[in-house]
Amino acid sequence: MALLQISEPGMAPAPHQRRLAVGIDLGTTNSLVAAVRNSVPEVLPDEAGRVLLPSVVRYLEKGGRRIGHEAKEQAATDPRNTIVSVKRFMGRGKAEVEGAANAPYEFVDAPGMVQIRTIDGVKSPVEVSAEILATLRYRAEDSLGDELVGAVITVPAYFDDAQRQATKDAARLAGLNVLRLLNEPTAAAIAYGLDNAAEGLYAVYDLGGGTFDLSILKLTKGVFEVLAAGGDSALGGDDFDHALFGHVLAQAGIDAKTLAPEDVRLLLDRVRVLKETLSSAPEAALDVTLSSGAHLVQTISHDTFASLVEPLVQRTLTPTRKALRDAQVTPADIKGVVLVGGATRMPVIRDAVAKYFGQPPLVNLDPDQVVALGAAIQADLLAGNRGTGDDWLLLDVIPLSLGVETMGGLVEKIIPRNSTIPIARAQEFTTFKDGQTAMAIHVVQGERELVADCRSLARFELRGIPPMTAGAARIRVTYQVDADGLLSVFAREQLSGVEASVVVKPSYGLADDDIAKMLEDSFKTAEIDMRARALREAQVEAERMLEATQAALAADGELLEADERAQVDTLAAALRAVAQGDDTNAIEAATKALADGTDEFAARRMDKSIKRALSGRRLDEI
């Protein structure tokens, strides 16, 4: 009888039976799909030989739609029903995109993520992205000749939980099994590292259509370790287009608010061509007629364009400096700078990067394709197609600290920023009041000391805590971040075993706490934050002391003489008078005075408790 053959879990059963998996770069402007063939990653073209799929979806009446090149060609004539740059809307609420520069859409006020009204009904960014992902899936299956087991989809390193979850939802709608969400800079490093057998410290400068990421990676003997990540989730090539768009209108004396939607789209398309032309020419000409009959003829020089976008270029260098500082390295320590994203083709970007790092950036891989290639390599490995030379390890990080709210609106950090993922960390907390039977767990993200200055991610409650005196219960709170960067939180009361948990899927309608700005604020206000934290801690301790004293007096006040009781009341009143003020030293001094003034009272209460416990018991029972 033939023996049954059992392959290693997750591995292809035989070398020739490869499991088909792809890497997808879901971009703001263009999207790509890549796969590993004959041990080499390659971008998969469509039937016309084009590898870039414009991230554009046009909706028609009665459920029809056009995706990619055909939709892009019709964007100027039907702007309200043609959705472009939808990645900028992923995981965002209506309040965050209502003022999106020059967007011709009708945004719908719906719960959660922003919705866009089209001729085919209201659509969410998840649905629009799913159309793009489905098109890439069909392309891959046609090219590879079979169904896919899954895909690695890349996201900006600074995408928050809402944006990552929205991306996974879009993939699910498109019929894709997500093997991993991979940060775009890390994907680029994989492509470069494996292709060139690189080792050392590398910076990945990723300027896409709608986001900017900067990651510092250490490549050593097959280990890809992300040391630090920085970025701006609201800065990309689109912003360079809008800067040029505004300049053209200003030169023509036209107010953008007076333009028809089709003129906005037409002019944006033309200035994008201008921008691309200026990447290889000293000047470029614009000649366009608007629907109003206005005829715009202008010539833009490269120097003019460079001065227009200089503030945007500098915005990319701010998180770059922070990432280097977090990684504790200098520009001179960086062995190479990898450029990612079509926007990095602009000479102003390459010149700025070369000047800052003191070396020309690496450009031997196509910046439009490098992310998809890296994702394909990771997908092939996760699908179980391990071959020789595939013994490498990916260590990614979280961009911002994760913490929990404690009494007084303070933040206790559980997982600090730039921690390698996947990761799990736990910390014990206790109750604040006697008889407390429930605890509210408020999960926050950010670097500041106060909850009000951080981003709220989720809230849940742990109920059923056995009634005990304040401080007796032990609640263990565990934070767990998976390889996709998604967070789960668990709380368990150690004595009773009651527990509660939440998978953090924050509201898609969160206000825009720009992550880069959050980090910048944390550096600028560190001293102020620490003073505020010290004040709140003093106030919380004062409140705890006052409540404990009040409870003790109510229970055992007869243990004090009249003059002793008056002294305790005086000390308590003095503490109460300063407890809500802003003088930390005064609060701490008054708290200490009350603690010292009640020491004798506490000793008498202890004696009373011991006598009560021993009453009526024999010595041999003790």
Swiss-Prot record:
UniProt xrefs under InterPro entries: ATPase_NBD, Heat_shock_70_CS, HscA_NBD, HSP70_C_sf, HSP70_peptide-bd_sf, Hsp_70_fam, ISC_FeS_clus_asmbl_HscA
Species in which this protein is naturally found: Burkholderia orbicola (strain MC0-3)
Alphabetical list of Pfam families matching this protein: HSP70 (PF00012)
GO molecular function, one term: ATP-dependent protein folding chaperone
NCBIfam families per record: HscA, PRK05183.1
Task performed by this protein: Chaperone involved in the maturation of iron-sulfur cluster-containing proteins. Has a low intrinsic ATPase activity which is markedly stimulated by HscB.
Gene label: hscA
Domain of life, per lineage: Bacteria
The protein's name: Chaperone protein HscA homolog
PANTHER family: HEAT SHOCK PROTEIN 70KDA
GO biological process: iron-sulfur cluster assembly
Keywords: ATP-binding, Chaperone, Nucleotide-binding
Gene3D superfamilies: 1.20.1270.10, 3.30.420.40, Actin, Chain A, domain 4, Substrate Binding Domain Of DNAk, Chain A, domain 1
Membrane listed as a keyword: no
Sequence similarity: Belongs to the heat shock protein 70 family.
